[in-house]
Amino acid sequence: MRPGFVVAALLLLSPLAAGAQTRTPEEQTFLDIYRELVEINTTDSVGDNTKAAEAMAARLKAAGFPAADVQVLAPHPKKGNLVARLRGSGNGKPLLLLAHLDVVEARREDWSVDPFTLLEKDGYFYGRGTSDDKAMAAIFVDSLIRLKREGFTPARDLIVALTADEELGASSKYNGVRWLLANHRPLIEAGMVINEGGGGELRGGRHLVNRLQTSEKVPLSYRLEVTNAGGHSSRPTKDNAIYQLAAGLTRLSTFDFPVRMNEATRLYFERTASLHTGQVADDMRAVARIPPDAEALARLSRDTVYNAFLRTTCVATRLEGGHANNALPQMARAVVNCRILPDHPTEDVQRTLVQVVGGAPITITPMGEPFNGPSSPLDPDLLARVERITSDMWPGTIVIPTMGTGATDSRWLRAAGFPSYGVSGLFLGESRAHGRDERIGVKDLYAGRQFLLRLIKDLATAP
């Protein structure tokens, strides 16, 4: 076979060949970065975050970044973090661009495709991390390289931090953001942070909403436990540990924490109302007012999504008890997972749990470090810039400030005094993040890349 035919045949066998389209050299460079990241396994079990960080560091150095401005810092051989800097003219505090390199577990037998081979198929990129969070990681590295090649000098330094163990959060002593704050804070000190947590929503192919996250709920689990002397099951007693715990959990199941609105949730309901009609739209406008309407709150609380925006929530997620089929239980234990509003002290949450489940004999113990994460102020200048770029790229799409009901590494930065915002311009339909066959739309990925580059340049030249 002639050499030209050999090359053509190899290209046809490439995982990207089936759906690949003609791309500009810049788009191809970005795709190479993205593919390299996705195809490096960065799961906690067998992956290597340091390998991914070093691969990105090599690309930045090859693009002309001095070694002093590109560092891989690792508290563990496989938990490396990349910190890179494009130096500006010094007019303002740096802008930190944050993404995490680690991904959740993915077993080949659970997927219809190889999770660690980037596949382009039917208008989507498939692979673990394609949406969470290697899309933003690749975009930030690509953006720094593009700006460097353009000779762009920002008014303030641009810092890219690609970190480890976001998915494990507070349970990991190697969480990259927490470790960098504790050990290398000057390298990431910034006046503003752009991170995951926002992003767009597609509905029926329409770009419906671009979200700007300014705050997020704090996750904290509690262990509820009852211990007992037990005994033989042929002689039941009234102080059965399982019954006592079950009674407390039943009381919790009927309890709602009080509504606590903040700046982000008020604006969320005010703007989301425009996407609805009838009673739902009226109720959203009514709860956005000060004070919110009680009847409207009650109706919206029946929806699990809106309820999560309105109050702290605590729900039983695990249950165990007893040690033998013919013995009275000596122990009954449950895990209650709480998602705590950013302005709601964790001490108050625990006191409320004690009151609701009934106190003794049920003990309640936090399973992690109690943590109060503040909100970031809703920056009107940032909001205006996001609105302008969104309107240019997707006319008719509204920007909605929001509070995340999950958790990202922004919580550690907000607590450290870094105003942090979740915004990406990545519009996701069924992304399947954390699930089987994770994917992102090809066009949506490239549009998000363009959105973030425009936003970065905008913010880099801001006074």
Question: Whereabouts are the PLM-identified features?
Answer:
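Acidic/histidine-rich, surface-exposed loop or edge segments in extracytoplasmic proteins
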Residues: 31-42, 225-228, 365-372
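Acidic/histidine-rich catalytic neighborhood of metal-dependent amide-processing enzymes
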Residues: 124-125, 131-211
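N-terminal signal peptide c-region/cleavage motif recognized by signal peptidases
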Residues: 14-17
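Acidic/His- and Gly-rich active-site-bordering loop/insert found
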Residues: 21-128, 137, 147-156, 336
